[in-house]
Amino acid sequence: FAEGETAEKKPEQDTKKYSKFFDEKTKWCDALVITCNDFRFTTATQEFLNNRLGLKGKYDYISIPGSIRNLMDSKTRDLVLNKFGVSVRLHRVNRVIILAHQDCSGYGGSAAFHESADEFKAISKDLKKARMLMGIKFRHLKVYLYYGTIFYDNHNRIYNFKQIL
């Protein structure tokens, strides 16, 4: 290098490089999926997204303990929404799929409720609030909600994901 020159790139060069990447990109992410990281639901969730919703290879996947509980907590809400915003903005997401499930430790598990109907009602209420919060922050998004359950039949796990309207 000549005297006074450095190997550092100027910020404008990086901006042009990334701008060109986004300008030339023709395929974008179809959805942002937000789900709990409970190991009992991992495989079933992937199968549901890939096969039943037809999203294989077309979504960003954010898995956090308790899923929407962090969005309900005013102390962590902004942090969570800002993290979601990165995916929404950079990958041009137009829809969000939020999955919650029965027996979630974030809610104290099923034992914290008198009946499974009470658990479903409480978590569904939070899912709907999450949809409202996402809609306030990201007005263009369509938000779809699902509640997952496990049934046991002859030692086999049977999963069901019910859409919450």
Regions found by a protein language model. Give the residues of each.
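Donor-sugar nucleotide-binding helix/loop cap in glycosyltransferases
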Residues: 98
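A short beta-strand-loop structural module common to alpha/beta enzyme folds
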Residues: 57-67
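Acidic/histidine-rich, metal-coordinating catalytic segments
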Residues: 101
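Divalent-metal-activated hydrolytic enzyme cores
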Residues: 1-31, 36-45, 67-79, 86-95, ...
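Short Gly/aromatic-enriched secondary-structure transition segments
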Residues: 46-54
